[in-house]
A protein has these predicted regions:
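A short, proline-enriched helix->beta-strand linker immediately N-terminal to the Walker B motif
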Residues: 150-154
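Conserved ABC transporter NBD signature motif
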Residues: 57-68, 72-73
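Walker A (P-loop) phosphate-binding loop of ABC-type ATPase nucleotide-binding domains
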Residues: 36-40
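Helix-to-loop junction immediately C-terminal to a conserved catalytic motif
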Residues: 49
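Conserved ABC ATPase "signature" region
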Residues: 97, 101-104, 109-127
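ABC transporter nucleotide-binding domain
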Residues: 172-260
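Catalytic Walker B motif of ABC-type/P-loop ATPase nucleotide-binding domains
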Residues: 156-160, 165
Length: 302
C-alpha cells in the first residue's frame, strides 16, 4: 500500500514557506526523509499525521484520502513525534494499558494480551513494572514505539527517533524499526545520514521545504562513483580550493582538513579517488545551500 503525496505546500502566518509542492511516493518498507534542522521535515510529518493542514495538495494512502478521511486514517496510523511527554511516576505496563483503553481495546483480558505482546516486541517486558521516570532515552523511545503500534497501524511515522540515543540504544532502536518495516509503511524523518544508509530502501533529501533528491540510497551512491576525490589540505588552502572546485564537505583529521571534491576529473595534484558513501550524496545534493562551512558530522558508532 503506497503513500502518495502530491504538490503539498505549507506557509506559516509569519511568511515562512515550510513546504513547497512536495511530491513523493512512499512504498511499503523503510523510507528515509533526510534533511537539516528546519528543512520542513517535522511540518510534513505533522501533516501526514493529520495534526496540521497543508495549504494545498493531496495525500492518499492506497484508496484513502488522508486529508478528507482523517478519522479513518488515524485508525491505521502510528506516530512517534520527535518529543513526547510521559508520566514519570507510572509504570510502562500501566500507561500502555491506559493508552490501549483509549485506543478502543475495551476488554481487560484483551488489553493485557496487547500490552504484553507490544512490550515484548520492543524488549521492555522485563522492566514493565519500572516507573517511566527511570527509563533511559532509548527505553523511552521504544516505549513510544509500543504506543504508536497500538491498533496494528499500516503506516508508522517516526520523527528524529535516534537523536540523543547512545550507540547501543541506537542500534537496538534501528533494528526494531527495520523489523516493523517488513510489513508496514515506515517513514523515518532524520538529520542523521547513518540512519538512512543503514535502514532505508528509498529516501528523499529535503531542504527549505523542497525535495532535492528522491532515490534508492545504493543507486544514489553508485551514481557518484568516480566523481569523489579527497585530499588533506591546510586551512589556508581551503578558500582557493572552494573557488576553483566543487568542495562538497570538509572534515578535521588529526588537526588537518580532509576535503571531498565532486569532479568528473582529478581536481589537482595530490587528490586521490574516494569510495563514495551516502554522506557524499547528501553533501553533493546540498552543496551551495548550507553555506561555506560544510563540516562532515562525526560518524555514529555502531
Amino acid at each position: 500500500m503506497e503513500l502518495r503525496i502530491r504538490d503539498v505546500s505549507k506557509t506559516y502566518p509569519n511568511g515562512v514557506q515550510a513546504l513547497k509542492q512536495v511530491d513523493l511516493t512512499i512504498p511499503r518498507g523503510m523510507y528515509g526523509l533526510l534533511g537539516p534542522n528546519g528543512a520542513g521535515k517535522s511540518t510534513l510529518m505533522r501533516i501526514l499525521a493529520t495534526l496540521q493542514e497543508p495549504d494545498e495538495g493531496s495525500i492518499r494512502l492506497g484508496e484513502l484520502d488522508v486529508l478528507n478521511q482523517k478519522d479513518e486514517l488515524r485508525r491505521t496510523l502510528g506516530y512517534l513525534p520527535q518529543e513526547f511527554g510521559l508520566y514519570p511516576k507510572v509504570s510502562a505496563e500501566a500507561l500502555l494499558d491506559h493508552f490501549a483503553l483509549l485506543k478502543g481495546v475495551a476488554g481487560r483480558r484483551a488489553r493485557k494480551e496487547v500490552v504484553e505482546a507490544l512490550l515484548r516486541q520492543v524488549n521492555l517486558w522485563e522492566v514493565r513494572k519500572q516507573k517511566l521516570g527511570g527509563y533511559s532515552g532509548g527505553m523511552r523511545q521504544r516505549f513510544g514505539v509500543a504506543v504508536a503500534l497500538l491498533g496494528n497501524p499500516k503506516r508508522l511515522i517516526v520523527d528524529e527517533p535516534t537523536a540523543g540515543l547512545d550507540p547501543a540504544e541506537r542500534v537496538r532502536f534501528l533494528n526494531l524499526l527495520s523489523e516493523l518495516g517488513e510489513n508496514s509503511v515506515v517513514l523515518l524523518s532524520t538529520h542523521i545520514v547513518e540512519d538512512v544508509s543503514e535502514l532505508c530502501t528509498r529516501m528523499a533529501i529535503i531542504d527549505q521545504g523542497e525535495i532535492l533528491l528522491e532515490a534508492e540510497p545504493l543507486r544514489a551512491v553508485e551514481e557518484l562513483r568516480g566523481r569523489i576525490w579527497r585530499r588533506v589540505i591546510s586551512k589556508a588552502e581551503l578558500p582557493q580550493l572552494e573557488r576553483e572546485h566543487r568542495v562538497i564537505s570538509t572534515k578535521l583529521l588529526a588537526g588537518r582538513t580532509l576535503a571531498h571534491v565532486d569532479s568528473d576529473t582529478p581536481p589537482g595534484p595530490g587528490f586521490e579517488p574516494a569510495e563514495p558513501d551516502l554522506e557524499d550524496v547528501y553533501f553533493s545534493t546540498m552543496a551551495g545551500r548550507i553555506g561555506r562551512r560544510r563540516e562532515r558530522p562525526e560518524p555514529v558508532a555502531p
